[in-house]
UniProtKB/Swiss-Prot annotation:
<dbReference type="InterPro" id="IPR038559">
    <property type="entry name" value="XkdN-like_sf"/>
</dbReference>
<dbReference type="Pfam" id="PF08890">
    <property type="entry name" value="Phage_TAC_5"/>
</dbReference>
<comment type="similarity">
    <text>To B.subtilis XkdN.</text>
</comment>
<dbReference type="InterPro" id="IPR014986">
    <property type="entry name" value="XkdN-like"/>
</dbReference>
<protein>
    <recommendedName>
        <fullName>Uncharacterized protein YqbN</fullName>
    </recommendedName>
</protein>
Amino acid sequence: MSEKQNEKVYDLSFFMPGQTIEAEEVEVPISKRFVDKEGNVVPFIFKAITTERIDELEKENTTYKNVKGRGRVKELDSQRFYARIAVETTVYPNFKAKELREAYKTEDPVEVAKRVLSVGGEYANWLNKAIEINGFDDDLEDLEEAAKN
């Protein structure tokens, strides 16, 4: 039997442009402090972002430093990187919204998120959920370690 006959043929049509299912929005309660008029917890709405956008965020949060004996070293601000992923992933509340930035007196959407999610654990819950929705199943420590290497 020739090698060609043993080769298995795989259907690549599943991976062609236009064949993928778009990422869905996911509602998740992040804090019990945000309630509507009926007293129901207001969920945050998340939607995964593209790999290309994650790459852009990584570049925006990476600096290069000259280290004696090692040359130019790449350094990722992993906390800011993950926070930016979370801001981009959060559809509601939109931390980039002008009204929120003005209300919290900052132009930085990450700062807005920190001020909105000011009770211990809320900010971490929000970050973890955004990371999870983007397909990162590892915990943040593992991701930070991988990003450093």
